[in-house]
């Protein structure tokens, strides 16, 4: 249905978009609600006293991955790490890639930038500065429960791995980004 680089077969486009000739949603489709659904997921966050508490989010995703995304977030929520999430995004229609399919999630983008990895320190493409794996509890690392939970369901992380392998990308890393593609793209 979808290859490692994000090429979607005609059958896959029919399932994802309701049209074998379509390759993304623009957000203006009359039938968008037939394919993009709002789900609720629970996460942990940290209050001003430094205590963790449960948060419930509404997240827009493609109906084809809705149950899987719920299961991923339930896995993250139930993990002993109790990884905190204070910003979360799903479907958006500003590009033609996985977010516009409803098949990508961004987590804590302030701490987990989209970076140019050829500079030292890394230069944020979104934001103004970036440093790898900060001390922030919101920072996603290769060994975090978040990365493991998405990987368990075949989703990839845009942040690469502990050895700086970025799934075929050698100049950027998108630490906030998880996608239906195993490559994280």
Located regions from the model:
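A short catalytic or substrate-binding loop motif that flags glycine-/basic-rich loops and adjacent residues
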Residues: 33, 98-99
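Surface-exposed patches in mature extracellular/periplasmic domains of secreted proteins
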Residues: 80-96, 157-168
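Short, solvent-exposed polar/charged micro-motifs at secondary-structure junctions
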Residues: 51, 55, 95-96, 168-171, ...
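Catalytic cores and adjacent binding grooves of peptidoglycan-active enzymes
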Residues: 101-185
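Generic detector of well-ordered alpha-helical segments enriched in charged/polar residues
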Residues: 2, 70-74, 147
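N-terminal secretory targeting signals
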Residues: 1-13
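Active-site acidic/histidine clusters and adjacent loop/turn architecture
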Residues: 12, 16-93
